[in-house]
């Protein structure tokens, strides 16, 4: 009799195990509900490096521990938009890639096809450079280096239109196009705002002619700088720049308070009738380095208002979503930057990692990028600088913080 009871108990426990595992997966995370999120709010991710990662042998897994397609896993966890950066020609004369995912138009087309196959829209992020474009550098592509301004403007228009044509021909669902990346003070080598505005309009024209339903976004950063976004928005208005979305980067350890972010985005939205969003954000879940190449955070002097934990990471993402939502109807979404840029191998096998970074471009830069970007990539080339800000651990297993995009609509009923 005791044996039969024991057997029944064992069987009942076995039946409960899947439920217990699922509960355990979610109960480690607390997410406070964001009220009144619209159904079409963008939960986006930039996974520009994923093809280079996969070619380097990186694998991703679902919450059950089974190997999974990254795009299917993301859409199953609430992601509805994929962002991909596009560089004109990120290769040297011998065809060696500059790294950072070697993000040419072919890379964008493949990522776009996989995103579309999983029901997600694509944000095409044109840098109009052969490598990273950001506030520190906006270098023109090699092929445009000796063009006069009018020819450069024509080249930008044609390149944008041809690239979008290739993506449309591949059946990609393009929802938005970014004309430039973090263009605080430059675009394709131009720093005068009158000329930059003409370049913005050349890109915008190419988008409008391709598909009038595609949103045109312009992207800036450093919202913490007093008056910056008000000045930029007024300058764009004065130069009659045609765009729909004013996009901002927001990294909690660099870019000030969320209250300020909401305030400056609200001002742009209310004054000029623009949609607004966060095009890039991320946060650390560990201070550990996974691949032997140093990370951008945490570092001395940075403001870390959240714990460096998985829960802290989830809180940071949730609060950015809240900040954009607080703008009102004009606040359309948030993109997480490179959540899957994890180590190609452990830190203790650094030399093997270096070989993979050089061969497949799966680090932030290769040594070959030195000819184009000698002062930055030429000195600091290597692996992923954000593996500790990913939403996957160093072995490709999803962190509970990946669930935050699903939970913000409902919240979780418990707090640890």
Residue spans of the language-model regions?
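Conserved, mostly hydrophobic/aromatic
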Residues: 45, 74, 125, 177, ...
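Bacterial N-terminal signal peptides
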Residues: 8-18
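Aromatic-rich peripheral "rim/lid" segments of glycoside hydrolase catalytic domains that contact
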Residues: 28-29, 267, 286-318, 323, ...
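N-terminal carbohydrate-binding accessory modules
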Residues: 23-79
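Aromatic-lined substrate-binding rim segments of carbohydrate-active enzymes
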Residues: 66-133, 193-214, 261-271
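Active-site cleft segment of glycoside hydrolase catalytic domains centered on the general acid/base Glu
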Residues: 97, 102-107, 133-237, 241, ...
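Active-site beta-loop-alpha junctions enriched in small/polar residues
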Residues: 47-50, 87-89, 127-131, 179-184, ...
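Glycoside hydrolase catalytic-domain groove-lining segments
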Residues: 69-71, 213-215, 228-302, 309-312, ...
